[in-house]
Amino acid sequence: TGGGAMMSAEKSLENAVEKAGISKDDIVRIVTTGYGRAYINSGDDSITEITCHAKGAHYLNPNVRTVIDIGGQDIKAISIDENGAVKNFLMNDKCAAGTGRFLEMMARTLGLSLEEMSTMGLEWKENIVISSMCTVFAESEVVSLVAQNKAVSDIIHGLNMSVASKVGALAARLGQDNPGEYMMTGGVAKNKGITNALEEKLGAKLYICDEAQLCGALGAALFAYEKCREA
């Protein structure tokens, strides 16, 4: 966010044009999205990440009607229509619980990388319940479980199920009679333990693209393309 977002955006743009073998002058239109979009002055248009995720999800799979986005800062449940337009959306409260940041903190508490945490969460045997979704209290629970010599894989599975319960409850509050096909976007979609737990809670299969964390960026690019065609 802030100046950091502006610097990151400029660096990302430089890397992108270099990789594509073009110059900045070749770019006709730029659309910014995400939390830091308000701080980026180089864009022609600024569109919310909710609208961009819906656009990107529809492009990748036109049958999707519910998008679950779990990023570093928040969780979103988005209902979209047959054209990819947003019908309704809900976000978690300002607490970090269940977000990518929450998982990073739990991984650090367990002395693991996020990749290790994702793999180990699939190897669980005992169904441990993490009762608190508050980051501070959940961390305390994890420390207590480690002291009780509980298997780390079981603790991770408990965390995964807690996250899935929170996300599932958010999706249910959308109040859709027919939620259609589900897509999960955001970096947390790379965590197989989370996706398995969420599929169990939703009672449905999640469509996950190869680079789920770029779905919003894809949507922004599609909006830029449409603007160019209209010009």
Predicted regions and their residues:
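Adenine-nucleotide phosphate-binding core of ATP-dependent small-molecule kinases
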Residues: 138-173, 213
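Glycine-rich phosphate-binding loop plus the immediately following alpha-helix
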Residues: 1-2, 82-126, 222, 226
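Conserved phosphate-binding catalytic cores of ATP/NTP-utilizing and phosphoryl-transfer enzymes
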Residues: 35-88, 172, 219-229
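Acidic-glycine-rich active-site phosphate/pyrophosphate-binding loop
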Residues: 26-34, 71-82, 133-140, 188-203
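Active-site nucleophile and cofactor-binding loops and adjacent substrate-binding regions
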Residues: 1, 45-54, 68-72, 90-98, ...
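Glycine-rich phosphate-binding loops at beta-strand->alpha-helix junctions
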Residues: 35, 175-201, 212-216
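N-terminal glycine/serine-rich phosphate-binding loop of ATP-dependent small-molecule kinases
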Residues: 1-49, 199-209, 231
